């Protein structure tokens, strides 16, 4: 009897769960939006992707190619209905023309259980007026002039990275796993350029700064489950006070940043890094606020306190630790697999070296290298670190095509996504997209690229604010590596990278193995 009652109870709970999971699945049919049939609980995410057997990136590209003729199509992310834009004109409207209606990212994941928590104060998480205030405060921090001041700090990290490679070669080890190598490099760059501390993750591979960075960026089962549950049940997750980030990691950075700020203020120390630039932005912000004659209510008055500053440092760390290393890994992979591109890049590097003579490489010379820029741009086309861009509709809105015809009627809080990776792999935008062709971005051909089909750093005012710094990190190390070493594939290097990627991460199963051969004295 107990077994029967238990079976009935389990069946009833299962039925409720099923009904709950499919409740939203009529959303796009009611609105006449093209979509593919979802499956309970997962929506349009295949089981094979969830189990790590296939790539979500490849799946999303294929889905785009099947539905792109509709300009807007629907995708169920678990049970959440998402509008995907495939038409450049609609992307322009959302990202540029009607930005005030599409200012914010989706709610939930980045806010955690406490809206006053540090992570909710980062530029990525802020919304509406508060975001605009912080963006305008931070924008002067990321100008070319300010980034140029960090070049020497990053160049020192380049030297440490190249010295490590040479030590490996001298010891008889010619093969290198690039993702780990580049992650250690980006860790050291962030440590010095953002937090003002010197670490060498090549000589001290288990240093605390690097270990915490790995814990923050690694994709664990529990971390993935938390993200999924925040998407499905954000209110419940907040009520249960489940933190998005490990608070021990947050406390580590809090002590690091606040300690550095206190010491610099007491000792009047000036160092051209992110903490200094943010402290300057904070001082400038407070001076403007004190001198302002605004009559707004005090509760609406903007602020930029130490927690706000810490939040931007944390964002800088979490955004730069993984994405720059990923870009470096894929750029090196493409140079390995396309030796003619590597040789052409080497020719430009040698020409620059000859032009410099005895002078060291500087920021302006590096950023002025045309073919290097083409190589990195093409790498970002094939392998954009941020594959998806999201926006939330702030009010009811009609999206219209170039002819003025209404394509879709959006409602307040509807979620709109732009599949950057799919746009970059669409043959209508980039012919033979699987081919690595840096010439797409040279002076002769770059005008052929349709506007709003190449978005490696996002679109509009909410595009990546730190893209100049990221590009400097990537280009400066690629310059030094190609100058000194010939990059070659090994037996462990995947010939078909897209087929080697699985799950939700932009990472091949075999990792990034590379053979390096010295070119002789640089």
Curated annotation (Swiss-Prot):
It is a peripheral membrane protein. Heme binds at residue 464. SUPFAM superfamilies: Cytochrome P450 (SSF48264). The keyword Nucleotide-binding does not apply. InterPro entries: Cyt_P450, Cyt_P450_CS, Cyt_P450_E_grp-I, Cyt_P450_sf, Insect_CytP450_Detox. GO terms for cellular component: endoplasmic reticulum membrane. GO terms for molecular function: heme binding; iron ion binding; monooxygenase activity; oxidoreductase activity, acting on paired donors, with incorporation or reduction of molecular oxygen. The keyword Endoplasmic reticulum applies. Belongs to the cytochrome P450 family. This is Cytochrome P450 9c1. It comes from Drosophila melanogaster. The gene is Cyp9c1.
